[in-house]
């Protein structure tokens, strides 16, 4: 019986062992759009539980953007909204994102996965989120909207 147990024992070969020192990790960016999205990004970042994630805040309301704790901030629609937001007009939100599309694309470059988070009750989140999701797709990132 003892010899049978020895035969049935399996051992992992060196090739089958998981490599704990892997250099492969996804480049993840979480983008908060508008007031609701920026609040969500601030909460996530301030929780301290998420490591290896870059947080980006995008808004037309300059004052609200200042309060967001994301390290990377993009103030969109400067010429269009003068920093006062979109007044709940999604078309203004879309135009504001288009106005800064190249900066958005540059920020998203290199991302493997982009989460776009926004509240859909206002103009910036509702109007700019689809433009930002398109930009993320253009840079080759898997894009998830929340």
Regions found by a protein language model. Give the residues of each.
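Tubulin/FtsZ superfamily GTPase core signature
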Residues: 1-146
């Amino acid at each position: 019986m003892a010899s049978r147990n020895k035969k049935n024992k399996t051992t992992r070969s060196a090739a089958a062992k998981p490599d704990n020192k892997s250099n492969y990790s996804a480049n993840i960016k979480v983008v908060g759009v508008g007031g609701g999205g920026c609040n969500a990004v601030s909460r996530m970042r301030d929780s301290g539980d998420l490591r290896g994630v870059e947080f980006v805040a995008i808004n037309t309301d300059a004052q609200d953007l200042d309060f967001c704790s994301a390290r990377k901030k993009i103030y969109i629609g400067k010429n269009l909204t003068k920093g006062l937001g979109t007044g709940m007009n999604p078309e203004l939100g879309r135009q504001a994102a288009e106005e800064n599309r190249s900066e958005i694309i540059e920020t998203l470059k290199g991302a493997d996965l982009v989460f776009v988070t926004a509240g859909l009750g206002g103009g910036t989140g509702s109007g700019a989120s689809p433009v930002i999701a398109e930009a993320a797709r253009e840079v080759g990132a898997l894009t998830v909207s929340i």
